[in-house]
């Protein structure tokens, strides 16, 4: 935390930035955040393709249509988050989180899965709606971790949002701590059937931006460290290890 606050102090000492520097920095962040957050989840667009798509609306080389639409939608979600974060008098709501999710996914779609016995099953991913099926993940230690059940999710999300709003007003936690703990608690719930990682990273930047901290990019090359931090937080059943998610 001391190093983060030191870097934040250095950032403040550079303010205000020249207009051209601010524009260039915002554009760089927009490209880096969109590219890395999507690439971490399997999006196949290169950084160059992402740049051409988001800055000029052009596509070069072979590109998956779903990945193109996903990248454009994520950029819309980023802008939506920044607008909402600027409205500092408005508390966080579940409605906003669900709207952000709907923006990312755009519409409902069907997923097909091949089962071990060779048969195929399918289910619908609902944009903007909490999960209706259990979800889990294989952790870095090789164990299966079950997220909150569909039945528990609405109450847990209500608790999370209420906790955040109260903690923000109380002011006992720094924005860095708020963002890290919110991220961790959100990921433990995994409220949606898809898009949870992208929403979590958008919400981290929502909290940082809301408190006038620079937004962050978790790069694909740091994915292993990112997952280890979450695993360490799970093992500790607390919030402190999650602070290692934040790098300014």
Regions found by a protein language model. Name each.
Residues 1-194, 198-247:
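FIC/Doc superfamily catalytic core
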